[in-house]
């Protein structure tokens, strides 16, 4: 009996006590530094969740844009406004633009849709059904911005390369020459539509992808393995940059925003900035990371809303 108490009862009670204390104290958070705790918290911030209702999946395509999706400066005190649309890579930039908009005292409205380029009258998707749904969604966006008087319209996305097979006209386009011609023509037409509304277009180049690296890399490096390589290669955005470069004279007010000017040194892009992990998954920024990039973008380059109209 004595042996049973020593070998079983006492150890069991000890571990139950430790577990109970751990639960009560939320897992002994003080065992890590404040910096580590902050890194862990940043990794679990998701714009697609915080902007639920304003960012839609395919089955929510019919959701219409709405003033209910306003963010940043309160509408009543705002000195300007902007509309941001595109795919999930536009959604993950909402905290970035919210930070800049608060600084400029303007209001934003987001209307983003999974896997849909922000280009009007373009059938874009992995199949004809999805391409048609994307085109309809952008028609809804176009009607909304034409009914308003936005100062800026932000176009952001996971932009395609010349070898994309996601353009339909009406059949799937596979020729790189046709891809470039259709992409360029439809982008120009979209910018003309935006220009006619009186808004200044802002094109945002895409951010890097992790290519298999874990978004937790910088946290693992700090905790377990200082030798971990937590950097990735810059996204060249080759097709979009080539097209934009060829049409600048047509749109002298067009603003280009490239977060990689802050995130990267030449082609080398650390996965953290000022001690904050930037990503939440393979190719999306977390909310805290996006805000940190915005703060540095405003300081080192310029707030694109600096000339917001009163």
Feature locations, PLM:
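Extracellular/periplasmic envelope-modification machinery, especially enzymes
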Residues: 1-310
């Amino acid at each position: 009996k004595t042996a049973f108490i020593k070998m079983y009862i006492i150890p069991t009670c000890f571990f139950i006590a430790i577990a109970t204390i751990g639960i009560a104290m939320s897992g002994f958070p003080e065992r890590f530094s404040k910096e580590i705790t902050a890194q862990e918290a940043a990794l679990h911030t998701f714009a697609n969740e915080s902007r639920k209702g304003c960012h839609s999946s395919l089955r929510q395509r019919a959701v219409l844009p709405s003033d209910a999706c306003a963010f940043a400066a309160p509408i009543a005190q705002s000195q300007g406004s902007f509309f941001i649309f595109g795919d999930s890579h536009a959604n993950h930039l909402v905290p970035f633009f919210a930070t800049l908009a608060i600084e400029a005292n303007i209001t934003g409205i987001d209307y983003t849709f999974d896997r849909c380029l922000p280009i009007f009258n373009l059938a874009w998707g992995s199949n004809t059904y999805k391409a048609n749904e994307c085109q309809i969604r952008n028609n809804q966006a176009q009607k909304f911005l034409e009914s308003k008087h936005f100062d800026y319209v932000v176009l952001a996305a996971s932009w395609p390369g010349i070898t994309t097979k996601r353009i339909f006209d009406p059949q799937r386009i596979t020729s790189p020459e046709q891809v470039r011609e259709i992409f360029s023509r439809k982008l120009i037409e979209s910018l003309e539509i935006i220009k006619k509304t009186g808004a200044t277009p802002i094109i945002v180049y895409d951010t890097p992808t992790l290519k298999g690296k874990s978004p937790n890399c910088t946290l693992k490096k700090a905790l377990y393995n200082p030798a971990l390589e937590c950097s990735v290669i810059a996204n060249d955005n080759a097709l979009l940059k080539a097209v934009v470069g060829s049409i600048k004279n047509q749109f002298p007010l067009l603003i280009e925003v490239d977060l990689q000017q802050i995130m990267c040194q030449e082609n080398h892009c650390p996965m953290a900035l000022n001690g904050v992990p930037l990503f939440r998954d393979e190719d999306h920024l977390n909310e805290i990371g996006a805000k940190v990039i915005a703060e540095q973008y405003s300081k080192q380059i310029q707030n694109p809303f600096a000339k917001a109209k009163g």
